[in-house]
Every structure is written in structure tokens, then in C-alpha cells.
């Protein structure tokens, strides 16, 4: 029991002794009354501003609690409905209210009007099936809301409207089938929400086109493990990107990210999402996810690099800060060694090294429009000297190969079309052509004339051998008939060459006139 001792007022001496004792009793009675001192109920345990009424089979809040308490624990009771009258008194200083492990099935509007300054509300392990619009609208200062281990299957887009200071929201262990994207986009988005736990629900996929719009500082606190995801390369690229950025939501629960194929049955084996060569997803698909979240900047070792923050909210009323790959905060007008941030959002790396490569997040905060935007930029650091030498080697090899091919083609063309032909070759070609054309008109061509040149006289005479034909017809008595009634012409021509004699005279071996036997 908690008692307060106050200084009793000085009683007038004119009061009689009996009346004085009666007045003292009245003062003490007023001081220890429930409304003034807040005596601790028999079902609770009180410690100054902390009251615990756990596991007492309570269905409502005791009415004689001290009004200035800061923490009230009503877990493991039988509270089933939260309406406007479930708390009989107003707790203006109450900051933590614990209602886990009750039978709460519904929350009415105005249920928390008597606790306007709550910062932490625990409604976990109850029987809530949905969260309606403006359920928590009175809790303007609420920072942590625990709704895990319920039966929630529907969240109204305006369910958390007005909770502008909400930082952590626990929704794991429910029956949600869609990712609550309204928490990050739209009219009722929560700008300060940096922790969202929707693990172990029934969410089959993530809206990839919208999740890329979530600022980086909010992405770090999204927990998705334990959901029955459908295997997809886009989901894999998102999670592997978070894993490479060392998000605790993926690093700490790597083995709890699983998926199933469409063809799998309900009880089929789950596949690990975060594994190498997952479903043969191409590297371009994975990189596409990286690029969608920002830009890529190339820097050279030892050369000053300037990276601009391409934010749509950037103007004179915008403040910029950067977050490095190691979660180091980079701000303007601060000594950060190798880094420097200007007021226009530009990041300068004076002497980049390989260890400076990674994903940098630029956070632009517009004071006038009350907007903020996060731009993720991938900075790659490479060695210009090494890359240049490799480039020159590749160029030299390609140029040599091309030159060799051109030279080969030129030589082939020269060989085909520019081969020299001597005069003797041309003369022989002409003679062969003439002899073939005159074969049908004459049996033998005439020999060279007397005025022929010396070269022409080198050639021998042409002769014709006539093949005798046997006529087996009757009346020939086996005689050989050289020429039958119809003349048969043999066109076999034999060329012979006789060397020139010392006296420069050329004799004919055979006459030009063919010998014909008479019949």
C-alpha cells in the first residue's frame, strides 16, 4: 500500500479538545481516500508509478488506481472488448499500457481517449481479426504498437492514420495476405516508421514496383521472413540486395526466407531463397534491381570523385545527409577525413580507394514541403592504370588481326587478277582456238608459208591418220574399204615439233596432201 504524508494544518487553539480530535480524523480520512491517494487495489501490485495487475481474471480496469501512474500491466486477464468506458478514470501520464494475452476481439473508436499520452501499447496475443479506420486516432504520441500473434487478416488503409510519431509496428504471426504498402505510400503513410515486422504471415509476394519507392532508412527495418513466398527472381534480387547491404532483417534470419514453386503442393519442400544460383536467375535481373534503387558512379583510385544527389525535392529549403556503406553518417561542415558533403547535396571523395566502394544513400529533407527522399547510389572504384593497359593490349591484338586479314585479301586478289602471262602463252592460246574452229572445214591446215618467221617454222607438219573401216557387207570379199560411199572425216590431229637443223632448213616428214587409196 502506498501512503502519502502531508503536513497537517495548524488548528486554532479556540477549538475544543474533542472537536480537534474529530477534525484530525476527517483530514486523515480525506488523505487516504482512493480518489486522493490512489490506494493500490488488492488484485494489483503497485510500485510508485508502476502498477501490475496480471493474471487476476479481470474483465475491466480497477477504478481505484492512482491516476498519475506511468506503466500499467493488465496482461493474462479476461478483457474482451475495448470501448469508450473500459477505463473508468483518465490516466494523463500513462506512457505504457500492456494488454497482451487477453480475449480482446474488437476495439471501438475512442477506446484510448483517457490515455492520450501513450507511447507504447501492447495488444499482442489476443483475438483481433481486423484493424478498422481511425482505431488509434487519439494516440498522437504513440511510438511503439505491438499487434503480433493475433488473427488479423485485414488492415484498413487509415487504420494507423494520425500516428505521426509511430516508429515500430509489430504485425508478425497474423493472417495478412498482402504487404501493408499504405504504411509507406499514400495519404496515411508513416514517415517515422523505421521498423515493421510482418514475418510469419501469409504474404505470397511483395509489390516490387512500390517497394523501390520506400526510403532506404525505412527499408532497413522491414522484416519479411517466415512468409510463404512464391519463388521469383525479382524477390530474390530484392533480398540479395538487402543481404549485401547487411540489413539485419535479412542477415539475422537468412535461413527463414523460403519460397515454393507454383507446381508444388501445399506441403511440399520449401526452397531457400538466399542461396547461390537460385533458380538460375540471371545476373542482369539482379543488377536490374540494384539500378532501380539508384544510380551507378564510376570512380578511379586516387582521383577526386564528385557524386551528386539527384533528388527531386532539392532546392534552397532542402538539407542533405549521406549514409555510407558502413552506415556512417556523412553531414555538411563536419570533419570526415576523406569525405566531404556540400550544402547542395554533392558528396566529394578526395582520395578514393577500393575500400570506399559500395552503396551510398543520399537523404534529402525538404523543410518547407515536409518531404524527404532517399537516393541510393552505387560507387564503383577501379584502377585506371590497370584498366588502360588491358585496353591497349586488347586494341593491339585486334588491330594486328585485322591488318593480317586485309593483307591476305589483297594478296589473293593480286594473284587472281594480276598474274603475268608471257607472249608464248598467248600465241598458243590463239592457235588452239583457230585450230578448233577450222576443224569442221578442213582436215588439215596448210603448212607455213615461205615468208613465215623463224619462230613459226619451228613447228612441224600436221598429219591426219585415217582409220580404215571394214565393210562386212556382201560382195566385198573381205577387202578393206578406206572410204565408203559416205565420207568419214577423222578429226584427230597430232602435233609434232621438229628441232631446227644447223642449216636452218625444215623438211616435211609427210606431205600436206593426205594419201588416199583407190578402190
Curated annotation (Swiss-Prot):
The keyword Chloroplast does not apply. Residues 288-378 form the Ig-like C2-type domain. It is a single-pass type I membrane protein. GO terms for biological process: cell adhesion; heterophilic cell-cell adhesion via plasma membrane cell adhesion molecules; homophilic cell adhesion via plasma membrane adhesion molecules; negative regulation of programmed cell death; positive regulation of synapse assembly. Its main location: membrane. It comes from the Eukaryota. The keyword Protein transport does not apply. Highest level in cerebellum, retina, liver, and lung. Lower levels in cerebrum, kidney, small intestine, spleen and testis. Residues 39-67 form the LRRNT domain. Keywords: Cell adhesion, Cell membrane, Disulfide bond, Glycoprotein, Immunoglobulin domain, Leucine-rich repeat, Membrane, Nucleus, Repeat, Signal, Transmembrane, Transmembrane helix. It holds the Pfam family LRR_8. Residues 1-38 form the signal peptide. Glycans are attached at residues 57, 103, 280, 287, 344, 372, 380, 383, 387. LRR repeats lie at residues 68-89, 93-114, 117-138, 141-162, 165-186, 192-213. Residues 39-397 are extracellular. GO terms for cellular component: membrane; nucleus; plasma membrane. Disulfide bonds join 40-46, 44-53, 231-259, 233-281, 309-362. Residues 419-519 are cytoplasmic. The chain crosses the membrane at residues 398-418. InterPro entries: AMIGO, Cys-rich_flank_reg_C, Ig-like_dom, Ig-like_dom_sf, Ig-like_fold, Ig_sub, Ig_sub2, Immunoglobulin_dom. Required for depolarization-dependent survival of cultured cerebellar granule neurons. May mediate homophilic as well as heterophilic cell-cell interaction with AMIGO1 or AMIGO3. May contribute to signal transduction through its intracellular domain. This is Amphoterin-induced protein 2.
